[in-house]
Amino acid sequence: MPQSALFTGIIPPVSTIFTADGQLDKPGTAALIDDLIKAGVDGLFFLGSGGEFSQLGAEERKAIARFAIDHVDRRVPVLIGTGGTNARETIELSQHAQQAGADGIVVINPYYWKVSEANLIRYFEQVADSVTLPVMLYNFPALTGQDLTPALVKTLADSRSNIIGIKDTIDSVAHLRSMIHTVKGAHPHFTVLCGYDDHLFNTLLLGGDGAISASGNFAPQVSVNLLKAWRDGDVAKAAGYHQTLLQIPQMYQLDTPFVNVIKEAIVLCGRPVSTHVLPPASPLDEPRKAQLKTLLQQLKLC
């Protein structure tokens, strides 16, 4: 089985649950993990954008990775986000993830400098060479300021056999279509996962493999059921779930960054966890909590 086969379907980018003093809330995180696995997800991604990796130090990231891997205990594949602004720390975190027992790593491009294509390729190759784990690229140009183009991704897939997929977080059907055509056309087992809830259906229609999207934290059943209907050949039923997913991104407009929105949605949908977030994020105020509750109720998610 190709390494990439581990990372298809619905893989929530798990929110990191914190205590009021900013420490990892182990019981809260464990309960969320258990809920998601029971919901039928295909894997779990820790320390992505929604996991607040960018607000954490390297040792904190290692501790969270270790806890998550140990608690999942091989029930589903685990991806650990290891990217950042410098190659040395990314390599250190990637090697730690491998030693801790991760199934793969997710690596975003450096996001302070605008990096030349040659240097981007070198960066990802250095990270891929530092581990034997499967490496999933992470494209989020709205936050990094720099797109990983399909041509660049194909070059990386050509170059390193353990670069096996991409989380393509971009609000563009054309970009997803080109990524699938360009990279999967040359490497059929290369995994293309969308990063936005409302792109899951069209990603599957285009020949992609699933989603790593935020609603997996508070409404995993919608994406899980959409994918099941798709795999069963019931396109009309899948399209019905798509109608719900189309409405979810409006919730994320309630604040920036919207990690607080996700945690409040988890609570409103029935899992009482701490909604503490790390600066520069801040708690969602009461008026916006009320707006969020109304949106979730309109979609019959709570």
UniProtKB/Swiss-Prot annotation:
Keywords: Cytoplasm, Lyase, Schiff base. The keyword Transcription regulation does not apply. This is Putative 2-dehydro-3-deoxy-D-gluconate aldolase YagE. CDD domains: DHDPS-like (cd00408). Belongs to the DapA family. Part of prophage CP4-6. It is found in: Cytoplasm. The lineage of its organism: Bacteria, Pseudomonadati, Pseudomonadota, Gammaproteobacteria, Enterobacterales. InterPro entries: Aldolase_TIM, DapA-like, Schiff_base-form_aldolases_AS, Schiff_base-form_aldolases_CS. It comes from the Bacteria. GO terms for biological process: aldonic acid catabolic process. A dimer of dimers. One of its GO terms (cellular component) is cytosol. Pfam families: DHDPS. The keyword rRNA processing does not apply.
